[in-house]
């Protein structure tokens, strides 16, 4: 690696939209994320079903799943 051309790697604070925050390493001082391991459905075990415009009901009617 060439000297003095790489950005400085430092501790960074990661802030999630849910309010959780933690530290990691990055070239930026602060990172803002929308979802983290504290609020992601895979890690929490809670599944969220997002129905945009009744698509789920339309699918169920189409294939007779109601």
UniProtKB/Swiss-Prot annotation:
Keywords: Metal-binding, Ribonucleoprotein, Ribosomal protein, RNA-binding, rRNA-binding, Zinc. GO terms for cellular component: ribonucleoprotein complex; ribosome. Binds 1 zinc ion per subunit. The keyword Hydrolase does not apply. GO terms for molecular function: metal ion binding; rRNA binding; structural constituent of ribosome. Its cofactor is Zn(2+). InterPro entries: Ribosomal_bL28/bL31-like_sf (IPR034704), Ribosomal_bL31 (IPR002150), Ribosomal_bL31_A (IPR027491), Ribosomal_bL31_sf (IPR042105). The keyword Ribonucleoprotein applies. Zn(2+) binds at residues 16, 18, 36, 39. SUPFAM superfamilies: L28p-like. GO terms for biological process: translation. It comes from the Bacteria. Part of the 50S ribosomal subunit. Binds the 23S rRNA. PANTHER family: 50S RIBOSOMAL PROTEIN L31, CHLOROPLASTIC, LARGE RIBOSOMAL SUBUNIT PROTEIN BL31C. Belongs to the bacterial ribosomal protein bL31 family. Type A subfamily. This is Large ribosomal subunit protein bL31. It comes from Natranaerobius thermophilus (strain ATCC BAA-1301 / DSM 18059 / JW/NM-WN-LF). The lineage of its organism: Bacteria, Bacillati, Bacillota, Clostridia, Natranaerobiales.
């Amino acid at each position: 690696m060439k000297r003095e051309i790489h950005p400085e790697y430092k501790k960074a604070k990661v802030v999630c939209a849910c309010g959780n925050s933690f530290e990691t390493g990055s070239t930026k001082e602060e990172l803002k994320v929308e979802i983290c391991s504290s609020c992601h459905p895979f890690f929490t075990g809670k599944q969220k079903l997002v129905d945009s415009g009744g698509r789920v009901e339309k699918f169920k009617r189409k294939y007779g799943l109601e």
